[in-house]
Amino acid sequence: MKPHTALMLVVCTAVSLVATADPVKRDFESDAVGAPPAGFEFARTGGGAEGKWVVRIEKGADKNRVLVQESADHTDYRFPVAVLKDGSYRDVTLTVRARPLSGKVDQGFGLVWRYKDANNYYITRCNADEDNCTIYHTVAGRRRAFLNHDVKVPTNAWHILKMEAVGDHFTVWYDGNKVLDAKDETFKEPGKVGLWTKADSVIEFDDFTVDGR
């Protein structure tokens, strides 16, 4: 076999493996109740206390395990995040089920992608206090919205939030309906992915799925 042919086979095989990699799905059923889930790291953008991310039995259920951010610190500019330790993604589809339980300052839940550190990443979030979904970038710890859509986000109800990132193009679905379609070039390189809340938002998360390309 010619050297360049062998090289092409290696490259094609690698590309094929990346393209057909199975999605990562975390349903928290194998994690210990009362402890942080394995495979995540935790951080906080802004002030106030660190987030408290623990696995609990779903409120009102007998046995379904969920990830809960349960710290109710009232600091307004406070954004607890939980990101997967492994994996770095540029083009990716993220999906999560989330249920806002409480929050006087806010009731926001979101998805994070192209995460560099606690002060630099993209986020899309839906808010049961404001009844809207928004895309932001957080740069050097400062959050800026670049697209917003008003939609009902009932408290104590499960919702499905989905985000697809392809290059500089981001599409967001809320409960099966496309609500946001935006472009931004702030972060072009791959980064980590994860979950987000704000202020005193107490949120349950389940079935976090990461489908990279």
Question: Predicted regions span which residues?
Answer:
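Bacterial N-terminal signal peptides
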Residues: 8-16
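Short tryptophan-centered beta-strand motifs in secreted/extracellular beta-sheet-rich domains
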Residues: 28, 94-96, 157-172
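Secretory/extracellular carbohydrate-interaction modules
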Residues: 33, 70-139
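Beta-strand-rich interaction surfaces with strong enrichment in secreted/lumenal proteins
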Residues: 80-86, 147-153, 194-195
